[in-house]
């Protein structure tokens, strides 16, 4: 079995860890970063992922996709998607089944497909670090993700060429990293406020057991919303001062987004920052510059209600866990937004204790995912992880009522069955409408799927016995079956994301991703071949220049011809042709190198001979200089 990597597939940034022996290790990207922006950019020639995609977003806003996680498993007409559309520079459209897709230059991409592009980059970075192929991963999701969102995440992994061994909740992964090697029993709260989602989980950690007691959250609350508040403020201030509305200028909005994100980070450590964006726009009077000072107090006022929205889920999670805030031993902060002083203060006020800041909030989730990978691979022993399902599961029954079979915060994996009957005489079939949610009426909850149990023998209403069974696996993904106990006839459904991809679509996307990986590999080979050729041309031309007229005309012409042939090959895209022309010039340039070496040797010998001649003359002069005229007196006896 190869290495199982742990991936935190984040809204804003993603991170990948691996177990090296018993220690989790962060895999840095080629740019040297420990996290990679979850951004994909499409240009005329190529597809960009990560830092390079984020850097070109200002000049290419309509074709740069960020925060795609917010669209995972959602319908295009969902209220949250409608809100996101208002601020998104890229186009969000309805895909098959009415699910939310993004459209780039006429091509529709599912959120799973775009996420797969980010995962493929993380996979490639891990392979470059390990020097071996990576095929298995543990991927994290927000604890409050529903079944559709979990299934979409798993599909993204498959498209990227990864066998997703486990989908694990982000707060659970964080607690696994926090509780790793800890023996003392503690009740901990993991407060996870990231780029796009918020989760709160109450867990018991200790003696190598991590048990989730309860979880709650908001899958549409995070740093992106905080950034948007700052952007709105900057747009309004600029409009007030200059009478120009920047909200209609997508390029300006992208610059404002970058500035808002930076200002928000700066104000976690400073009391005031200046946002300075020269040439943000222009009118008939000339270019306009944006210069606005933003204080921490002003930022806190802008986002106070967003921070307040995190408190109610905390109350619900504690209630479900049967604990009071004072019974929680530690509050662990996860997600970049928890660096904000106002967030830390709200958490401290609610739980009555200072939060634990010992873990890196950007990396702790992927670290936990890698530990889970180590557990699955058998490299990490004696660690038991007990997770829960975040939302209640059930079916629609007579009168449009939602009948729960599995309550929220039930430990998974789990299986539960309940017997139902028919509502009419001689009813030949029953429709099973599978749902997830907490509302009493079916219409207010989320549909996971529908299926029919047919062939029920004619009988008065209330007589047939239909057993409905729910089975949730360790990934939190649902299977449902219905069985007529009278005939033994059974029908089952594996719930795939109702707004997700069919098996055929996934297989096609897997093939497309593999083809794209081959294209990327060929592109890399072409760049490397051109670089090698360019380097050889430079050294060859320099050697020709150094030798000047001392080179035979035939050899000089041969080298010049082969150099020209290589330059022509470099203009094309045939890697083999470039390599062949490079080899031919390399062989010819060996003769050139020999000539140059011989010239240098001759020069060195000439210099040595001249030095030797000078030495002899010097020695003679030196001897002559040693002769001294002396006065003397002749003594006679």
Curated annotation (Swiss-Prot):
Coiled coil: none annotated. The keyword Iron-sulfur does not apply. Pfam families: HSP70 (PF00012). One of its GO terms (molecular function) is unfolded protein binding. Residues 600-621 have a biased composition (Low complexity). Induction: By stress conditions e.g. heat shock. It comes from the Bacteria. Residues 600-637 are annotated as: Disordered. The keyword Phosphoprotein applies. The modification Phosphothreonine is found at residue 197. Residues 624-637 have a biased composition (Acidic residues). PANTHER family: HEAT SHOCK PROTEIN 70KDA. HAMAP family: DnaK (MF_00332). This is Chaperone protein DnaK. The lineage of its organism: Bacteria, Pseudomonadati, Thermodesulfobacteriota, Desulfovibrionia, Desulfovibrionales.
């Amino acid at each position: 079995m190869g290495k199982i990597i742990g991936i935190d597939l984040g809204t804003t940034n993603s991170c990948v860890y691996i177990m090296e022996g018993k220690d989790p290790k962060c895999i840095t990207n080629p740019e040297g970063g420990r996290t990679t922006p979850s951004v994909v950019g499409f240009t005329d020639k190529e597809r960009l992922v990560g830092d390079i995609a984020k850097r070109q977003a200002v000049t290419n806003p309509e074709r740069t996709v960020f925060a795609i996680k917010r669209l995972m498993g959602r319908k295009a007409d969902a209220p949250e998607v409608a809100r996101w559309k208002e601020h998104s520079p890229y186009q969000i459209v309805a895909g098959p089944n009415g699910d939310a897709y993004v459209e780039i230059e006429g091509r529709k991409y599912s959120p799973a497909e775009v996420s797969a592009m980010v995962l493929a980059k993380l996979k490639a970075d891990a392979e470059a670090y390990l020097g071996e192929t990576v095929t298995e991963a543990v991927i994290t999701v927000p604890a409050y993700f529903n079944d559709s969102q979990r299934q979409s995440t798993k599909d993204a992994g498959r498209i990227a060429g990864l066998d997703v061994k486990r989908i694990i909740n982000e707060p659970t992964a964080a607690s696994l990293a926090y509780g790793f090697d800890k023996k003392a029993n503690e009740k901990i709260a993991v407060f996870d406020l990231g780029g796009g989602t918020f989760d709160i989980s109450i867990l018991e950690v200790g003696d190598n057991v991590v048990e989730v007691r309860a979880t709650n959250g908001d899958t549409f609350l995070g740093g992106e919303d905080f950034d948007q508040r700052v952007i709105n403020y900057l747009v309004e201030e600029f409009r007030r001062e200059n009478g120009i509305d920047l909200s209609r200028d997508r390029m300006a909005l992208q610059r404002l987004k970058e500035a808002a994100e930076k200002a928000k980070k700066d104000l976690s450590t400073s009391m005031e920052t200046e946002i300075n964006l020269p040439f943000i726009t222009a009118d008939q009077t000339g270019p306009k510059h944006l210069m606005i000072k933003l204080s921490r107090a002003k930022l806190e006022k802008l986002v106070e209600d967003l921070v307040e929205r995190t408190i109610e889920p905390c109350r619900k999670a504690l209630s479900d866990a049967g604990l009071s805030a004072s019974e929680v031993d530690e509050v662990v902060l996860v997600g970049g937004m928890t660096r904000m002083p106002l967030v830390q203060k709200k958490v401290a006020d609610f739980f009555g204790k200072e939060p634990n800041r010992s873990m890196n909030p950007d990396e702790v989730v992927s670290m936990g995912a890698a530990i889970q990978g180590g557990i699955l691979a058998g490299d990490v022993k004696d660690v038991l992880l007990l997770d829960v399902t975040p939302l209640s599961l059930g079916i629609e029954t007579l009168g449009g009522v939602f009948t729960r079979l599995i309550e929220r915060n039930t430990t998974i994996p789990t299986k539960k069955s309940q017997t139902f009957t028919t509502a009419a005489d001689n009813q030949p079939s029953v429709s099973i409408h599978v749902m997830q949610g907490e509302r009493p009426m079916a219409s207010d909850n989320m549909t996971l799927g529908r299926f029919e149990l047919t062939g029920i023998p004619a009988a008065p209403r209330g007589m047939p016995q239909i057993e409905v069974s729910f089975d949730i696996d360790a990934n939190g993904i649902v299977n449902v079956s219905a069985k007529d106990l009278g005939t033994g006839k059974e029908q089952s459904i594996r719930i795939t994301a109702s707004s997700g991809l069919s098996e055929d679509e996934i297989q096609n996307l897997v093939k497309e991703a593999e083809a794209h990986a081959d294209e990327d590999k060929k592109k890399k080979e072409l760049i490397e071949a051109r670089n090698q050729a360019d380097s050889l041309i430079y050294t060859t031309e320099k050697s020709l220049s150094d030798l000047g007229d001392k080179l035979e005309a035939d050899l000089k012409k041969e080298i010049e011809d082969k150099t020209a042939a290589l330059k022509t090959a470099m203009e094309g895209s045939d890697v083999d042709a470039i390599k062949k022309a490079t080899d031919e010039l390399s062989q010819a340039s060996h003769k050139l190198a020999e000539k140059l070496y011989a010239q240098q040797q001759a020069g060195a010998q000439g210099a040595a001979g001249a030095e030797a001649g000078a030495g002899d003359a010097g020695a003679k002069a030196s001897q002559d200089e040693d002769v001294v005229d002396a006065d003397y007196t002749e003594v006679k006896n």
